[in-house]
């Protein structure tokens, strides 16, 4: 079965269909987080609120998910320490190894809590990054060279001046992405709150 956030219900899903769905979500999340790692501190500051979300709900769910909460807290704490050296101008870089791990960890946590659909809101910035890249490539091929964005994924579009011509600084982009993620983490918490019977 598949849990539907905000509706607080589960719908039956066949095992083959669930396997296909899980593969799509895991691969999509891993690659989306990897795309987000294009500006100093961006992937880490966007993923930290996501991990804090999973840590908080583990406390509401009791001992059953305590180990998952410890895992999520460990990643959040590690990212906090990492960000000291990864904020602009970065001295240490995450690279594909780090961003792919974060994407895998986020997807794994969502499935371990049996709420993968929460990534629609919780991972909103990952989705925007991935969609901007897909739209850019698709539109470029369909129009033989025209672009929707100045550069993709979306954080590079902002760096290049976006649609307004105002070029965003790396620190501004990080603040925007992290802030939006925090807001949607709160929204996600509201969406699953009733599941814990509190």
Q: What feature does the model see in each segment?
A:
Residues 4-16:
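Short aromatic-rich membrane-water interface segments that cap or initiate transmembrane helices
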Residues 17-198:
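Alpha-helical transmembrane segments
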